[in-house]
Amino acid sequence: MIPATKNTKDTKKMDATADNVPSLCDAIRQTAYDLHVYLGVGYLEKVYENALCHRLEKRGMSVRRQVPIRVSDMDGYPIGEYIADVIVENMILELKATSTLTDAHVAQTLNYLKATGLKHAMLINFGSETFQCRKLAL
């Protein structure tokens, strides 16, 4: 499992626990939506990642970018590695800048959850004219 990081801000820590997952999702979703309205479509995924992380950090959230996730065989032998776009308060954020979300994007995000042991993720697409955001859980 990926170790948690400390929140260095003097604000209340929002961790992705059963009690506050809805409020954490709402805060992330609203921040991402506001960013989508501000920037619109057409930028590379990295631009949206940088801007979203900046805005979430300003809200006092613990944000980690480009987090390596090891995939192991049943016996623990490492067989591959993913890179998660962003982890906020133990919730994976998988960001896209494509015309629409696909089943493959959902499967990728669910695999990140399986590989990390984390329970919650959000799949956010900035590339569509209509804002797309899906909450996923195991």
Residue ranges and their predicted role:
Residues 32-38:
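N-terminal capping segment at the start of a domain
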Residues 1-19:
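Short, low-complexity, charge-dense intrinsically disordered segments
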Residues 92, 96-138:
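Nucleic-acid nuclease catalytic cores
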Residues 78-82:
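A short, glycine/Asx- and small/polar-enriched loop/turn
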